């Protein structure tokens, strides 16, 4: 959670919370509706100011261990590991302090448990802030394996997980590559994302094969126009673009692709929104700004489909549909870029 979500009384007087549910609350309501295994850390962290740095937007070691215990519980492990009490002091310069006082920032004392140092970095990463970190814990030869998609909030979270798992991979790269062989390698997969980055779920959907669907077409929707682009992104073909209208509740977007042998398969596309800021919004790990050229407002779509035997699929072999699997309508695809 954002620091301001947990401690709104610490915000300036002119900071006024908006009406209605927050994006955080809407996300967790939707995850519950879809029965996604999600851990809401807000209840775990609320009320304890000792869990976040004073002059930093992130949680400190205390907060990270609260999060660690809750996440491990969400993974089905009955008891969180006891890391003991702090027996060392580190120093940390907060991101807020560095922004507000670049010349006079004051490092904060960070009580540290050396029991969290029971791991080694197994790749060429220099530390927990690197975008891709592989770890090994020699004390856990029969332990589990972990893949964590994460952001900077996991800088303090990484040591506890790295010390718990025999082997672990921590990556900041987005979009998430859910087709990566590492997903199969890991016994546990965790997605940690800061509240302030929730919106990028809508702008950077993960790399993964679009789910196959069997659709029933009810004909053509007259007057509807779509802009579509097809590009190669090995091992995928990416079909993306924008609709000229909002989808009604329950409607989805499908792309139908004819293969080299004449076979036809429909896939469900991700709904995608246009990034509101630059592609470096997600801590410098964002995807190319090129995506925004055909994704407009919140009417975008993107599907990663398998390549045909001949490589790129010809443009004439693709049709776009909106609706549901049981009843959808083809929309015009003449405007192809």
Which sequence ranges carry the predicted segments?
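Extracellular glycan-modifying ectodomains
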Residues: 1-337
């Amino acid at each position: 959670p954002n620091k301001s979500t947990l401690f709104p009384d610490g915000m300036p007087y002119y900071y006024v919370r908006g009406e209605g549910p927050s994006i955080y609350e809407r996300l967790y309501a939707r995850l519950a509706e879809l029965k996604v295994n999600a851990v809401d850390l807000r209840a775990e962290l609320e009320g304890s100011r000792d869990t976040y740095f004073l002059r930093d937007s992130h949680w400190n070691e205390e907060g990270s261990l609260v999060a660690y215990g809750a996440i491990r519980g969400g993974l089905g492990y009955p008891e969180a590991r006891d890391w003991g009490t702090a027996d060392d002091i580190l120093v940390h310069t907060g991101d807020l302090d560095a922004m507000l006082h670049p010349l006079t920032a004051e490092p904060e004392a960070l009580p540290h448990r050396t029991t969290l140092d029971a791991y080694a970095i197994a790749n060429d990463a220099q530390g927990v802030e690197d975008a891709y970190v592989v770890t090994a814990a020699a004390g856990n030869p029969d332990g589990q394996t972990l893949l964590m998609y994460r952001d900077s909030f996991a800088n303090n979270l990484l040591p506890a997980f790295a010390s718990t798992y025999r082997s672990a991979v921590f990556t900041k790269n987005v979009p998430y590559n859910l087709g990566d062989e590492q997903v199969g390698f890991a016994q546990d997969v965790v997605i940690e994302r800061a509240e302030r980055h929730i919106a990028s779920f809508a702008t950077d959907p993960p790399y993964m094969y679009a789910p196959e669907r069997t659709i029933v077409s009810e004909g053509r929707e007259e007057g509807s126009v779509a802009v579509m682009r097809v590009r190669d992104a090995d091992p995928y073909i990416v079909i993306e673009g924008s609709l000229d209208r909002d989808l009604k509740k329950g409607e989805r977007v499908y792309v139908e692709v004819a293969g080299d042998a004449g076979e036809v398969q429909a896939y469900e596309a991700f709904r995608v929104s246009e990034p509101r800021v630059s592609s470096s919004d997600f801590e410098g790990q964002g995807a190319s700004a090129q995506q925004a050229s055909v994704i407009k407002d919140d009417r975008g779509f993107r599907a990663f489909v398998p390549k045909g035997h001949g490589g790129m699929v010809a443009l004439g072999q693709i049709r776009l549909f909106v609706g549901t699997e049981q009843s959808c309508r083809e929309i015009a695809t003449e405007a192809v870029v």
